[in-house]
């Protein structure tokens, strides 16, 4: 039985402490302080009908703009998103992609989501209870990360916004991450309650920012780019902690992605910047990035 969830992430931050150190302290404090019971997975014999896979989440799973399929549903779900590739990789007997561009945690659990083609029910309501594999990509819209990072954008080539040295920027980032962990934990708990025998995999964020900026695709100084990259590393720390404390699995999609950020050459780029091409979305993984994400997930579930 679910007894209680972590009510907050403790923030420990002194004046010149960087974002990485501050959020690392927050994650460690959360892990040490949280005491709760998470619904354990129900032991079940291997499904005779094969893997029954359900993909949940936001645009990082949906893959808007990757192909024409994404234009035929209000959620922007593409056949080139990592869920389709994972379904093929595991030889899924059934596959249901419920991810929806713009989704926040509440749209997965209990709140209908408006789309360009009407309102869709909460994703969990449409998820079959006999699912044996569930992936989840979530969190980016909860914290509205583009707004947080946009404070680092320079207004001219060669400029430096200096967001890395702005306490207000760090405070906003820390506040956003502080509220994210409990939301993701609750979402994982709701998934477990709906599909008690499922293997649940939480897929991480990041990959867009590397160690440098590139005008105008990522109009950010090299030093601030490192800050932004660190922000996503800390976001992944929060997600990984939610997974670890809920008995689910976490996949870091930035592993193996060095040199494939939005400032990489077009043929090496897996994640788009602000100026994406017609077959990808700004600030999202492109088809190559989705293939990488699928490979990372398959490395865990196969």
Question: Which role fits each region the language model picked out?
Answer:
Residues 102-121, 262-277:
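Charged, often glycine-rich, active-site loop that binds/positions anionic groups
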Residues 41-52, 85, 116-135, 140, ...:
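Short amphipathic alpha-helices and their capping/turn segments at secondary-structure boundaries
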Residues 2-45:
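Secretory targeting and sorting signals
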